[in-house]
UniProtKB/Swiss-Prot annotation:
Described function: Catalyzes the methylthiolation of an aspartic acid residue of ribosomal protein uS12.
Gene Ontology CC: cytosol
Protein name: Ribosomal protein uS12 methylthiotransferase RimO
InterPro entries hit by this protein: Elp3/MiaA/NifB-like_rSAM, Methylthiotransferase, Methylthiotransferase_CS, Methylthiotransferase_N, Methylthiotransferase_N_sf, NA-bd_OB-fold, Ribosomal_uS12_MeSTrfase_RimO, rSAM
Pfam families noted in UniProt: Radical_SAM, TRAM_2, UPF0004
Binding site for [4Fe-4S] cluster 1: 22, 58, 87
UniProt-listed PROSITE patterns: MTTASE_N (PS51449), MTTASE_RADICAL (PS01278), RADICAL_SAM (PS51918), TRAM (PS50926)
Every TRAM domain range: 393-461
Cofactor note: Binds 2 [4Fe-4S] clusters. One cluster is coordinated with 3 cysteines and an exchangeable S-adenosyl-L-methionine.
Protein source organism: Paraburkholderia phytofirmans (strain DSM 17436 / LMG 22146 / PsJN)
Amino acid sequence: MSATPPIVPTATPKVGFVSLGCPKALVDSEQIITQLRAEGYEISGTYDGADLVVVNTCGFIDEAVQESLDAIGEALNENGKVIVTGCLGAKKSASGSGLIEEVHPKVLAVTGPHALGEVMQHVHTHLPKPHDPFVDLVPAAGVKLTPRHYAYLKISEGCNHRCTFCIIPSMRGDLVSRPVADVMLEAENLFKSGVKELLVISQDTSAYGVDVKYRTGFWNGKPIKTRMTDLVGALGELAAQYGAWVRLHYVYPYPSVDEVIPMMAEGPYKGHVLPYLDVPFQHAHPEVLKRMKRPANAEKVMERVKKWREMCPDLTIRSTFIAGFPGETEEQFQTLLDFIREAELDRVGCFAYSPVEGATANELDGALPDEVREERRARFMEVAEEVSAKRIAKKVGKTLKVLVDEINADGGIGRTAADAPEIDGVVYIAPAAKASKRYKVGDFVSVKITGADGHDLWGEV
């Protein structure tokens, strides 16, 4: 990295920002931007309007690595002063040196993920902060990169699992749970700012508190254990006060999840703790799961899914899977297809297995040809979409609560409790006439569902 002298801005220093990767990386970006704003920096929407640029990278799969390297290159070409942070910053090249520094030696500095303090130190070094920070001008909820009516709430960092296809622990470290009081304070500030939906995220939401032995914290004078079940209950109580939603992501299928389902189905938190689980099953055959080092047993998972649906018939389950994992036989793949049909998962994504540099799965025998992996992914998605279409068709004729995300010339676009933003379906709301006068973005409206197609619904207010 070059020893570049500090930039001397002619007015208020401006920082450009590029955020790549998953919602967890987005939260890291929000924290950095919040701190920049608190210290008096302006955020520039263009390269040429910025004194320097921060690029928050992703390094999980090869495509993400290339996208991040390209983004860094673009920022260097367009601006020339670039600080890099994020998962790719922790990735080494084949020679053992930093990958980013090797590909782009002109960057000013590189940090790993979840490195607010380091990033700010580098910003201060290369672009000294203003003398009069305006901390009071920054909202208590912080600066958010999502629309104003929903936000991601990250409850922990890192992961204790060592799945063979994943390199996240090498980049983000072991599980570190946030203090429950900090999580609740952020949630309250977000609700106060007008957020109508909180999306709880982490690498492993079910493991929240394991690292601190579920120690008891306090919020508004009440004891709350650092444990997923207790946190969800507290968030549900808070959401009920603001008429808002709480949605759970990255939930491993541990027995403790059984304690959360009743909150979705009945009691004071029904309608606030959404009947929605994002559960990364990844596969269903025990031998494949063993090679993946996944903390799950397929038979017990099926029993658990059935139990969840018995407790909460409206439950929506989203999951992701990998097809064509090293050593996967056709018989094992058929077991996966059978699981999808029997479990009747509502929302499903699938990746054809792709080697990730640094993953231990690369050392496994039985690597499958690209065409086999892609063919299995296509077959998987065909079955998954059939199941999803049957599930969603059952909603026609029902009246559902919808959170409005957008209003345009054709009417409104929103989501039900079964739809997370950006990854699930939407509801197209008619009529278009006077839509903007009847409701606004962030409102909840009751919609009579009149049609379904693929992952989306159509309806009328």
